[in-house]
Design a protein with these regions (language model features):
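Extracellular/virion structural assembly segments
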Residues: 91-96, 104-133
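Oligomerization/assembly interface segments of phage tail-like spikes and tubes
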Residues: 93-108, 164-179
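Short, cysteine-centered beta-strand-loop-beta hairpins and adjacent loop/turn segments enriched
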Residues: 85-88, 106-111, 178-185
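Small/polar-rich, solvent-exposed N-terminal microdomains that initiate assembly or binding
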Residues: 1-91, 190-193
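Solvent-exposed amphipathic alpha-helical surface segments
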Residues: 16-20, 137, 141, 180
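C-terminal tail/extension regions appended to the core domain(s) of diverse proteins
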Residues: 3, 10-13, 166-193
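Exposed beta-sheet edge/beta-hairpin loop segments within beta-rich domains
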Residues: 84-93, 157-165
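Acidic-leaning, charged glycine-interspersed low-complexity segments
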Residues: 73-76, 118-177
């Protein structure tokens, strides 16, 4: 599921900024590595919000900081959190995963208030474009990990990090989906063994 999220959000930034910093080795013994690289290559024509120049994905602030220290311009940072699983009464779960989708711009140390305001305006427009795509994809039923209601019940909050020299906005989502980890299906299969 986390790999599906990675590939989904990889369709938004400029293609050149996706692999840079994420797939630094280029190959791995892990089978999924090559599969994901091929999926990224197939996104060549997407670039749904090409003004986003870089892509950062993960949970670690230290990794985020290392990555952002090496880039310039705007970036999409997708941070995934805990999955809350509640029985739905039909031998399945309703799963809720916290996802934070940040679009920010790294500015120079000497950026003034007007430059910060422009960066905030640009990144807010980029977040709105991503949100619109999420809404359309959820409405079409293309996101098994998020239903239509959860994409419209969200929050957009400012992202300000003096440490990262970055300013932008974060779309906070509680993505709800039916047993997104297929836990019940696995349990039924194990019971038959």
């Amino acid at each position: 599921m986390l790999l599906d999220l990675f590939v989904y959000f990889a369709q938004f930034p400029a293609t050149a900024g996706i692999k840079k910093g994420i797939a630094t080795k280029g190959k791995s013994n892990m089978e999924e590595y090559g599969t994901i690289l091929k999926a990224i290559d197939n996104l060549e024509d997407k670039q749904l919000v090409p003004e986003i120049e870089n892509y950062v994905y993960g949970q670690s602030f230290d990794e985020l900081k290392q990555r952002i220290d090496k880039l310039a311009g705007s970036f999409l940072f997708v941070d995934y959190g805990e999955v809350d699983m509640q029985g739905d009464g039909h031998r399945s779960f309703e799963c809720t995963q916290r996802i934070a989708v940040t679009v920010a711009m790294k500015l120079s140390d000497n950026a003034d208030m007007l430059e910060r305001m422009i960066a905030n305006d640009r990144t807010l427009q980029m977040v709105a474009k991503i949100h619109a795509h999420l809404m359309a994809d959820a409405e079409r039923g293309n996101l098994y990990w998020m239903d239509r209601d959860s994409v419209t019940n969200c929050e957009i909050v400012p992202f300000v990090s003096a440490e990262l020299h970055s300013y932008g906005w974060t779309l906070m989502l509680s993505a709800k989906g039916a047993d997104i980890l297929d836990t019940h299906q696995l349990a039924r299969r194990l019971m038959r063994e």
